[in-house]
Amino acid sequence: MDDKSYYEEIESILRQILQPIEKISFSTFIRVVSGYKIIPIDLSKKEDKELINDLAKACNEVIEEIKKTGGVKTKEGKTPKRVNEVGNHIEHYVKDVLNKYGYAITPKTKKGKQKSTGYPDIEFWYKGKKERDGRVVYIEIKTFNEKNINSSHRTFYASPSKDEEGVKIRYDAPHLCLSFKIEKLGRDYYATGFKIIDLSKLKGGIKREFNASNRELYKKDLIIYEKDLK
């Protein structure tokens, strides 16, 4: 193979690799990036039905707790400035309530280090009082409203960790999304409903992208002209 054919083949392969992947199951994605399986929920099983019933009770309690605080508040008691921040601040309500039904923590990596960023939001030991006590369930917190529930915009993200030690999944387990319906009343945001979603059945896409940091973008050898008005 001559150099021209070689580079043409490399370019062709890269072009195919960089194409978005459509309709991949979340279960497959999680198994590839973590090595662990998503266990589907089967409501014909007593233990699964009991789990979902208790999570539904917990979601109702979260809604009531939000009412008591006069809408969703940060841990410091402030109202989120933007609606897309609300989901982040519902998490502490959810953790507090889930601790009545088990043991809820920020997920740990394989090295045992807690990591708040990335998927999933919560590692929940159902009916347990500590780690490895009870049944483990991974939980992601989301929000929605009547206007955006049928939107085609991407709202659910999970990215592979740069290294295997950064993955926040350590067990085969159910993966559930607790999504709260949000309505704005005055300046405050209230939860007025919820959905419990079995992520084992979710299908989505993988979109590759090129990215660079500011440090990489603004290197001196890249800049061909600049001006700074002082």
Swiss-Prot record:
For this protein, what reaction is catalysed? Endonucleolytic cleavage of DNA to give specific double-stranded fragments with terminal 5'-phosphates
Top EC group: hydrolase
Superkingdom = Archaea
Protein EC = 3.1.21.4
| Keywords tagged on the record | DNA-binding, Endonuclease, Hydrolase, Nuclease, Restriction system
- Protein's GO biological process: DNA restriction-modification system
* GO terms assigned for molecular function: DNA binding; type II site-specific deoxyribonuclease activity
Q: Describe the function of this protein.
A: A P subtype restriction enzyme that recognizes the double-stranded sequence 5'-GTAC-3'; the cleavage site is unknown.
Q: What is this protein called?
A: Type II restriction enzyme MjaV
Species of provenance: Methanocaldococcus jannaschii (strain ATCC 43067 / DSM 2661 / JAL-1 / JCM 10045 / NBRC 100440) (Methanococcus jannaschii)
What gene is this protein a product of? mjaVR
